[in-house]
Swiss-Prot record:
Pathway: Isoprenoid biosynthesis; isopentenyl diphosphate biosynthesis via DXP pathway; isopentenyl diphosphate from 1-deoxy-D-xylulose 5-phosphate: step 4/6. It comes from Paraburkholderia xenovorans (strain LB400). GO terms for molecular function: 2-C-methyl-D-erythritol 2,4-cyclodiphosphate synthase activity; metal ion binding. The keyword Secreted does not apply. Belongs to the IspF family. Its cofactor is a divalent metal cation. Keywords: Isoprene biosynthesis, Lyase, Metal-binding. SUPFAM superfamilies: IpsF-like (SSF69765). The record marks H36, T135 as: Transition state stabilizer. This is 2-C-methyl-D-erythritol 2,4-cyclodiphosphate synthase. Involved in the biosynthesis of isopentenyl diphosphate (IPP) and dimethylallyl diphosphate (DMAPP), two major building blocks of isoprenoid compounds. Catalyzes the conversion of 4-diphosphocytidyl-2-C-methyl-D-erythritol 2-phosphate (CDP-ME2P) to 2-C-methyl-D-erythritol 2,4-cyclodiphosphate (ME-CPP) with a corresponding release of cytidine 5-monophosphate (CMP). The gene is ispF. Binds 1 divalent metal cation per subunit. It catalyses: 4-CDP-2-C-methyl-D-erythritol 2-phosphate = 2-C-methyl-D-erythritol 2,4-cyclic diphosphate + CMP.
Amino acid sequence: MDFRIGQGYDVHALVPGRPLIIGGVTIPYERGLLGHSDADVLLHAITDALFGAAAMGDIGRHFSDTDAKFAGADSRVLLRECFARVTAAGFSIANVDSSVVAQAPKLAPHIEGMRANIAADLGLPVERVNVKAKTNEKLGYLGRGEGIEAQAAVLLIRN
């Protein structure tokens, strides 16, 4: 069998006047993530991990932040398109593991919604998708609440 591991990373600044969307879940908060699309840091990290595992480049190669057609894009749509491309290349997803690092807001109440969205978008049972919420223990730009970071790992199997 041909197994492929992919690793993804993303970070966005928190700013006033934007919704906070993580894992496809809109989270009540006074600030949101700055980005060309909806800036869903978690879905961007997972998308990057999927493209990386399939040796298909990264999210920017497929969905450029300089392309006007992706302005304000729903990252769930981008994740589904990534999944279609990875599947067309002959891969299936074994599992997804991810971490979101945010000093605030508390993400634990939203984790199951994130898992459900990701599982639905990738055609997986929810037990094959994991999302962890972490703080940065008040250290650095994440600890000061200046942004939110996500990391993801995926395992692909060639069909």
